[in-house]
Regions:
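Substrate-binding rim/cap in mid-to-C-terminal beta-strand-loop elements of soluble/periplasmic
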Residues: 1-52, 123
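Long, internal low-complexity/basic segments
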Residues: 19, 72, 83-85, 91-111, ...
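C-terminal helix-and-tail extensions that cap enzymatic domains
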Residues: 45, 55, 160-161
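WW-domain-binding short linear motifs
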Residues: 57-60
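Glycine-rich phosphate/pyrophosphate-binding beta-alpha loops
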Residues: 63
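Residue-level detector of beta-strand structural context in well-folded domains
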Residues: 66-68
Length: 161
């Protein structure tokens, strides 16, 4: 209250992961270099700085099944033919939702969605935009190899793509 202008929309992509850095910024806490490796404070946006942009090119997503995705601008790339485990299609019946197992070998290896025109992620456009798949795939690989998507020292990683 009293910090963020009311009823304002911004077009900058932030994620749940950014709450750590933002709340640390609000409270004056310091986030160690080996914590919150993908977290960026969006406090400047809350204060009304419409020109602010995060110090990263894309937001990394990690599913319940341990699958990676990346969102950059209007694009979202999933390096997995399924849903990530929370809904169909998934390779095993879900423990949380009543969904059937799907043979993922019948589905495309990559999924690319244009979230400006397809927010529901119904139309995979990976074949139509191979250059975007390559660019975002390289970016995600770099983030994973560095153990972070934000500036700072590289961190150990426990997953690869």
């Amino acid at each position: 209250p009293g910090v963020a202008p009311a009823e304002r929309e911004v077009s900058v992509t932030v994620g749940q992961v950014d709450l750590l850095a933002t709340l640390a910024d609000v409270t004056g806490a310091t986030v160690p270099a080996n914590a919150g490796e993908d977290s960026v404070s969006f406090l400047p946006l809350l204060r009304g700085d419409a020109a602010w942009r995060p110090a990263r090119e894309g937001v990394v997503h990690h599913s319940a099944d341990g699958r990676f995705a990346i969102r950059a601008g209007k694009w979202k790339l999933l390096l997995w033919p399924g849903s990530g485990g929370w809904s169909s299609p998934t390779p095993t019946p879900s423990r949380w939702l009543p969904v059937e197992a799907t043979d993922l070998s019948t589905l495309p290896k990559y999924q690319l969605y244009d979230l400006e025109s397809d927010l529901a992620e119904r139309h995979n456009v990976a074949d139509a935009h191979p250059e975007v798949v390559q660019r975002l795939g390289r970016l995600l690989r770099r983030y994973i190899e560095d153990g972070r998507s934000t500036p700072g020292p590289a961190q150990p990683v426990d997953r690869t793509i």
